[in-house]
């Protein structure tokens, strides 16, 4: 969905379709971004279940249940780390460097997607702790505030 990737969308969709076709044992689901510049390439997605964007809670549920994620979203990159899911980040660079090498890898070009996918396809379990925290920050803040107030 990133502007930097708009010209690459057709190539990424073709690579994703190739992965889906060559891995019939896996279900590929793509919540499609509402941007018309992305949607106009939907016909390139073969063997991929294309769905409308998911509400946040449904997206979190999908992330928690999936095996592997391919995305260019930094937010999804963070959520994937929290749920110990491997993610292939389709960008030349990311602002979220903490998870690179553990739960995420950069896929800088569409033609690199197959290699990244094959690397993570069988090796999809994340052993490392989430670099963005354990999900208890609000409770920790409340405890600190109780001591201060």
Predicted feature descriptions by range:
Residues 2-30, 35-149:
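Nucleotide-activated sugar donor-binding and catalytic core shared by glycosyltransferases
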């Amino acid at each position: 969905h990133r502007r930097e990737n708009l010209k690459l969308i057709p190539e990424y969709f073709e690579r994703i379709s190739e992965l889906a076709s060559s891995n019939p044992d896996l279900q590929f689901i793509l919540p499609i971004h509402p941007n018309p510049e992305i949607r106009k390439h939907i016909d390139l997605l073969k063997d991929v279940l294309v769905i409308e964007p998911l509400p946040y809670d449904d997206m979190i549920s999908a992330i928690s249940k999936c095996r592997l994620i391919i995305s260019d979203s930094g937010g999804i990159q963070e959520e994937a780390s929290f749920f110990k899911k491997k993610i292939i980040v389709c960008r030349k660079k990311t602002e979220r460097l903490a998870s690179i090498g553990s739960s995420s890898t950069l896929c800088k070009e569409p033609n690199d997607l197959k290699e990244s996918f094959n690397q993570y396809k069988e090796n999809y379990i994340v052993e490392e702790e989430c670099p963005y925290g354990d999900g208890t920050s609000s409770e920790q803040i409340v405890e600190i505030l109780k001591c201060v107030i």
